[in-house]
Amino acid sequence: NTPNTFGIFVLDCVFKWLEENGGLEGAISRNKAKSNLLYEELDRSDFWLPHAEKKSRSAMNVTWRISDQSLESIFLKDAEEAGLGGLKGHRDVGGIRASLYNGCTIDSVKALVKFMCEFEKKHG
């Protein structure tokens, strides 16, 4: 059997990137910072309705709804136009989902939170 050489190459690249960026501890720290920033905004106002209870929240996939669900399609359209794509929730659950994987930067989460604040001011 021939090993999956491309898969091995990609793993090597990912492992090197992890090592150069603080290892697993660095990745965990960055991911917590990103999710904490977003959850702080979600918890700040009744405009946003996070799905998960605080003790069960994910650091990778943050899901929520808007208290007035008729605004969700507007939020998603406006977010896409602002360069914040891929926020549509799971097809079975709906709502909004931000996936904060390792490649997602803290600056992109800050941009999302800023957009959310502006959206709430306009529609809240």
Regions found by a protein language model. Give the residues of each.
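Short, glycine/charged-rich beta-strand-loop motifs at protein surfaces that mediate ligand recognition
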Residues: 61-66, 85-86, 99
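Conserved PLP-binding catalytic core of the aspartate aminotransferase-like
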Residues: 48-79
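Conserved PLP-dependent catalytic core of the aminotransferase class-I/II
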Residues: 15-51, 77
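PLP-dependent enzyme catalytic core of the Aspartate aminotransferase-like
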Residues: 81, 90, 94-124
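Predominant activation on well-ordered alpha-helical scaffold segments within soluble catalytic domains
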Residues: 8-16, 36-39, 73-76, 110-113
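A short linear hydrophobic-aromatic micro-motif
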Residues: 47-51, 83-89
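A short glycine-threonine-serine/GTX helix/turn-capping micro-motif
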Residues: 1-4
